[in-house]
């Protein structure tokens, strides 16, 4: 399997803060990324859930909290019925999960001595997306054998069935492939043609 990253020199990466889901931990682990390097290079921090303020009524006390730790016993009983019967004056997540309490106290999901990608509480990351893109490119080209071409797509060459057969680049000729993934955001350079 040969993977080639084709990147336009004319399009600046998005350099805003982003949040991920816990599945990102396993993805990074599987491709051999050091979690310590990832934190350092991408200005990453722990994310233990998502809180949506003003979720239903828009009032200051209206929020929905989605912790990343599954509630104990959630497969054996209807936790919502128990919450409604006994604790509906409190936030559901805080009743069924310890993770909102960790977050409220600014506690991490693991200790400094906990091995990479292991944790007491499930977590994801907040990160700088621009730095993350550069970090992944360096890791994938340096350690995973991904080829990198910085060039512009001039035209798209279709096969008889209408699928993309190859891309004509401004400076690097033709790049053929079996699968093309369009990451050109709103431009939809490949999907739109």
Enumerate the predicted regions with their spans.
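Short, well-ordered amphipathic alpha-helices
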Residues: 1, 31, 191-193
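Glycine-rich FAD pyrophosphate-binding loop
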Residues: 1-16
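General structural concept
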Residues: 4-7, 24, 31, 38, ...
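Conserved beta-strand edge residues that scaffold enzyme active sites
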Residues: 7, 42, 154-155
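Short loop/turn segments at secondary-structure transitions that flank enzyme active sites
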Residues: 9-12, 58, 183-189
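Dinucleotide-binding Rossmann-like beta1-alpha1 core, especially the glycine-rich loop
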Residues: 12-103
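Alpha-helix-centered segments that form part of catalytic cores
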Residues: 89-127
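Predominantly flavin-linked oxidoreductase catalytic cores and closely associated redox partners
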Residues: 114-193
């Amino acid at each position: 399997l040969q993977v080639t990253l084709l990147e336009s020199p004319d399009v600046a990466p998005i350099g805003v803060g982003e949040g991920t889901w816990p599945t990102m931990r396993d993805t990074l682990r599987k491709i051999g990324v050091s979690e310590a390097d990832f934190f350092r290079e991408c200005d990453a921090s722990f994310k233990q859930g998502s809180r949506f303020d003003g979720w239903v009524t828009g009032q200051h006390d209206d929020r929905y909290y989605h912790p990343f730790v599954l509630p104990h016993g959630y497969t054996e009983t209807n936790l919502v019925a128990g919450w409604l019967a006994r604790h509906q004056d409190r936030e559901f997540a805080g009743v069924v999960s310890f993770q909102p309490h960790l977050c409220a106290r600014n506690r991490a999901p693991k200790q400094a001595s906990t091995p990479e990608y292991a944790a007491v509480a499930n977590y994801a990351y907040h990160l700088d997306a621009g730095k993350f893109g550069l970090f992944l490119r360096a890791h994938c080209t340096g350690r995973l054998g991904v080829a990198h071409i910085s060039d512009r797509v001039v035209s798209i060459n279709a096969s008889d069935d209408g699928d993309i057969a190859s891309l004509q680049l401004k400076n690097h000729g033709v790049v053929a492939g079996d699968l093309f993934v369009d990451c050109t955001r709103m431009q939809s350079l490949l999907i739109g043609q």
